[in-house]
UniProtKB/Swiss-Prot annotation:
Residues 61-93 form the LDL-receptor class A domain. It holds the Pfam family Trypsin. High levels in pancreatic, gastric, colorectal and ampullary cancer. Very weak expression in normal gastrointestinal and urogenital tract. Coexpressed with ACE2 within mature enterocytes. This is Transmembrane protease serine 4. Residues 54-437 are extracellular. GO terms for molecular function: serine-type endopeptidase activity; serine-type peptidase activity. It is an enzyme of class 3 (hydrolase). GO terms for cellular component: extracellular space; membrane; plasma membrane; secretory granule. Proteolytically processed; probably by an autocatalytic mechanism. Residues 205-434 form the Peptidase S1 domain. The chain crosses the membrane at residues 33-53.
Amino acid sequence: MLQDPDSDQPLNSLDVKPLRKPRIPMETFRKVGIPIIIALLSLASIIIVVVLIKVILDKYYFLCGQPLHFIPRKQLCDGELDCPLGEDEEHCVKSFPEGPAVAVRLSKDRSTLQVLDSATGNWFSACFDNFTEALAETACRQMGYSSKPTFRAVEIGPDQDLDVVEITENSQELRMRNSSGPCLSGSLVSLHCLACGKSLKTPRVVGVEEASVDSWPWQVSIQYDKQHVCGGSILDPHWVLTAAHCFRKHTDVFNWKVRAGSDKLGSFPSLAVAKIIIIEFNPMYPKDNDIALMKLQFPLTFSGTVRPICLPFFDEELTPATPLWIIGWGFTKQNGGKMSDILLQASVQVIDSTRCNADDAYQGEVTEKMMCAGIPEGGVDTCQGDSGGPLMYQSDQWHVVGIVSWGYGCGGPSTPGVYTKVSAYLNWIYNVWKAEL
């Protein structure tokens, strides 16, 4: 066995000292480590400053393009072009006129289809003879629906008051067949443009109580800068129904979000809004037209906790004392109350409009495009934060018959809640939808 001639220690000696890792000299740390730490801290500080600047700019300023410059955010949607290309007025709440009458409608008599003869102004019931899926799709498109419809034959009833005619299509609209004879099938067309108004759970008829999203899967929270402002109702994958007065203070679309799928505020993801559309203001009736449609940037995926509610039928006239439901996260007391974190529900009833307009109530302020609901003795009502939410009626499905609009106080016996009557605005809703197809 060879041995290093310069070594004093034999190779087979057990007296071997372990090797030690060399220590990093303090001078090296001072020269390399400290500058690296300083650089990292400086970079972190710069990032924090940049983020803070961006947050401040996004909150208080809007960036115009060509040329790039900032304008105060309060100048957004003020009706004046402050950016050279007008970007500051693009993403704003827009008004939409009522428009022409939509020439198809659905009746509360089993959702039967009626068609307008534009030449005479008369309405006719659609006979089931030769009615096809293509005609059903045309009818629903005329009302602005994009989903696949369903239809069936229902027997002509003894109270049928409209003439029954065969239907054809011309220029993507339904028309009466010129040579239409008697309705040989003896059946009308029952049409459903969207599966709606079905929930997983039926509410109990009691006073005010905590609600479950399983009972009201169409209820949404409409929020500005992450703060709940109003309620709303899902009508289809793209559209949410609410009140126009929710957007009086903030008419820019950017910071509005919709939250769906939960009965707890803030516990569900937000959805971006593409458009907010209101009806044109009528100075003669300033409290009329309190209705708005929000178009979502991306369509909703329906589930057990996210579903649409049905629109009312055009002839849905509810008599006094008809039971209805209200829901919302609004204030639990008129004075000194606070917003509820949990969705609340309550049973109310239709209040006669004559009683609602009495001298000790609203003194004629409630118009034909509004309706009143509450309980005669008072104490159950919508309040601040419930605005825009649905007033609901259940037949075979749930229908949104009203939108929480206004009132004097919350829960007074002579001043019940006043609601936008949705059936009065069906034509406007259909025209908006058609324009956005």
